[in-house]
């Protein structure tokens, strides 16, 4: 199999790169491990944009946002949660993304449910990748006889959620924060660290008091794990000690309210953020185990909402995703491996100052 452009990962960056490249006449193949593209803003369930007003107003993101706003009748109708000006249901996001994919025409091919196995290299040059279908019934890759398919490309793009291309290609990368002495960034720490941001298995909830379904807790469930996630169940009012504000129920449930009496569960305070370790990145089998534990944590928090916080009317939205458990097909991975190249983005590249047009 040969293509001009191979994009490994159909997340937010990968799908946008693929659409634009195909529009420019480049034969493009996207390899996506899950059943859904869109990454953070759809497949991972974060259907409330990080960044407001002008932050996602241009390019493919701007087109995507405009389609969502048009669906709901304007931007005022997507400002349903105080976390974002653009909140939307996953099905609406999928429809908007499908339209953008269609606009790319025949130059764009997407192989879903297809796993990255290894990177093809010649000397110091990446020539493509070997991939493997995980569900041949759902993937165009099934037309090939071999279970592992080599894909050769003029250009290969790293767009995975974890930076797996960097790892498998043996390229240099880093985790954590650089020191201010290395980066020159005033906001960077004095000493570097390898602290990796938490990941979150988000969930879309729906308010339905006539159809209450209590989510069963795990065997590890302990409601005290979530103490101080809101003011409704707390043992301290010292927000300096807690290092965050204590929100009441109304503030909590309006945080990421979606249209249609729905809610994005991605609460940042002592709820369903899952501590991330390097082995999630380095060991693919342990990654699966950790992701199940992250999903378990989210289920436990939903149970906690329904029981300890006294709101059984909020349950998992069974219409949000075509997955067996109605969860998003992938987690929200905040931090990928970061390649160490000739240049990397720094604070001064994005912060406005008097010498730039930003």
Locate predicted features.
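Conserved beta-strand-loop-beta-strand element in the redox core of flavoprotein oxidoreductases
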Residues: 120-150
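Beta1/beta-strand and adjacent pyrophosphate-binding region of the FAD-binding site
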Residues: 1-13
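Flavin (FAD/FMN)-binding glycine-rich loop and adjacent Rossmann-like elements that form
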Residues: 113, 135, 144-155, 159-358
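Conserved N-terminal/central alpha/beta ligand/cofactor-binding core
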Residues: 20, 26-27, 32-118, 174, ...
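Soluble non-cytosolic domains of exported or imported proteins
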Residues: 12, 87-92, 288, 292
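Membrane-embedded transmembrane-helix bundle of lipid-linked glycan/lipid transferases
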Residues: 6-8, 17, 22, 120-125, ...
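Glycine-rich phosphate-binding loop of nucleotide-binding enzymes
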Residues: 12, 127-129, 159-160, 164
